[in-house]
Each structure stands twice: as structure tokens, then as C-alpha cells.
A protein has these predicted regions:
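Generic detection of short hydrophobic beta-strand segments and adjacent strand-loop junctions
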Residues: 22-26
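Short, surface-exposed, charged amphipathic helix/loop patches that serve as local interaction elements
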Residues: 2-3, 28, 32-146
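Short, intrinsically disordered N-terminal pre-domain segments
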Residues: 1-20
Length: 146
């Protein structure tokens, strides 16, 4: 009986399958036609982002160095890494998210996405901040398995 050769496949490396980030467009709950482009960051990316915002200070009482997170810098870096854009953020929606005076604008017009606008919204609108953080933290939002 002739011998059949069985080809041995090289094992697949998980590292070759992993992707550090993925951006998807997600509907913002409660606001018709408003979508936010969010980027999922792998744990390694989040750790790298956090490390950028750490500084070491000397504690005179304990005589030990202590790491301190610069929260403002972290918010800037987090927004840059996670919020990639939005569409349909009407001025009337802003009134439900934070205290604003939009009387000079058509309530149906939209606030354009800018890095500064994203940071201010994250800093001052706790509902938006909470939603972004929870949505980005849920891997299913980025895998299509929901």
C-alpha cells in the first residue's frame, strides 16, 4: 500500500490574528440620526495611552516615588484615540446633554465634530462620557456578534 504524505501545517500564531484597534459607527441612544465613530483599543493600546499620561513625583512623607495620572492629558489622549467623529449631533440634542445656550442656532443644525468639541463633550456631559466608555469597553460592539 502506498504511503500518503500528510502535510504538517504550521500552527497559527494568535499574534498574527490580533488587531490593535477597530473603528465602527454606532447609533447614539435616544437621539435620532446621531451616530458616533468609535475606535476599540486593545488593552495594550490603552495601557500605552495611560503611560503617556503618567508622571512620577517624589512623596516627601514616604520618601518614595509615586506615579500620578494627569487626568486632563488622559482625557485628551483618550478622546483622540477613541472618538473618531460623529454625525447628526443637533444643537437641540446638546441641551439634553449639558448646559448650553444655543438660542442663536437652528436647533436642527448640527455641531461639527472637532477634537476640541469631543473633549469638551466628554469633560462636561457625563451621559456622553459614560456611554462612550461603556460602548468602547464592550468588545461585542466591534465584532458584529451582538
Amino acid at each position: 500500500m502506498p504511503e500518503t504524505k500528510v502535510e504538517k501545517k504550521e500552527p497559527v500564531s494568535l499574534a498574527s490574528l490580533m488587531t490593535p484597534s477597530k473603528t465602527v459607527t454606532i447609533d447614539f441612544p435616544g437621539f435620532a440620526e446621531m451616530t458616533v465613530d468609535l475606535c476599540y483599543l486593545a488593552r495594550e493600546e490603552l495601557v500605552r495611552l495611560r503611560k503617556k499620561c503618567l508622571s512620577t513625583k517624589w512623596n516627601k512623607k514616604t520618601r518614595q516615588p509615586e506615579e500620578e495620572l494627569n487626568e486632563d492629558k488622559f482625557l485628551v489622549e483618550y478622546c483622540k484615540g477613541v472618538i473618531k467623529g460623529w454625525k447628526g449631533l443637533k444643537y437641540r440634542y446638546l441641551e439634553e446633554l449639558l448646559l448650553v445656550d444655543v438660542g442663536d442656532f437652528d436647533p436642527e443644525d448640527c455641531l461639527p465634530y472637532t477634537q476640541d468639541n469631543a473633549e469638551l463633550l466628554m469633560k462636561n456631559a457625563s451621559d456622553f462620557d459614560t456611554w462612550v466608555t461603556e460602548t468602547v469597553g464592550d468588545l461585542e460592539n466591534f465584532t458584529g456578534n451582538k
